[in-house]
Amino acid sequence: MIRRRKKVRKLRGSHTHGWGCKKKHRGGGSKGGRGMAGTGKRNKSKWTWTIKYAPDHLGKRGFSRPPEVQRDVRIVTLKFIDEHLEDLLQMGIAYEEEGKIVVDTTQFADKVLGTGRLTRPLTIKAKAFSAKAEEKIKAAGGEVILA
């Protein structure tokens, strides 16, 4: 149980409640505004501070592309295909056909990129290939099929 009396009870009738001049205990107006108030285009009351410490505070830069224009291209690399070939065979993404291994990347990726190298000839089926990927697949004795 708190028994201490509020200080305000002692100060009843006091004009300023211990704050000196009445002006001194006003809100943000006596402090030049709250936060970044006054840093706008007009008047520029805090302009020197703004140009020194927050030069990017005003103005716009760049743009954001509309979501309907953006495309999320799922990629897979030759390195990934070569390293995970056994897993792909178990999952049914890759299969053997006429003694050749066919990898159908259309199930999990849109484009095959040429990072890494192939250690065996593979037939790779995809929606798109980079130029380097096509080159490396053919150099390894494989085949490229656009789906």
Swiss-Prot record:
GO terms for cellular component: cytosolic large ribosomal subunit. GO terms for biological process: translation. It holds the Pfam family Ribosomal_L27A. Residues 1-28 have a biased composition (Basic residues). GO terms for molecular function: rRNA binding; structural constituent of ribosome. Keywords: Ribonucleoprotein, Ribosomal protein, RNA-binding, rRNA-binding. Residues 1-43 are annotated as: Disordered. Residues 29-38 have a biased composition (Gly residues). Belongs to the universal ribosomal protein uL15 family. Binds to the 23S rRNA. Part of the 50S ribosomal subunit. This is Large ribosomal subunit protein uL15. It comes from Pyrococcus horikoshii (strain ATCC 700860 / DSM 12428 / JCM 9974 / NBRC 100139 / OT-3).
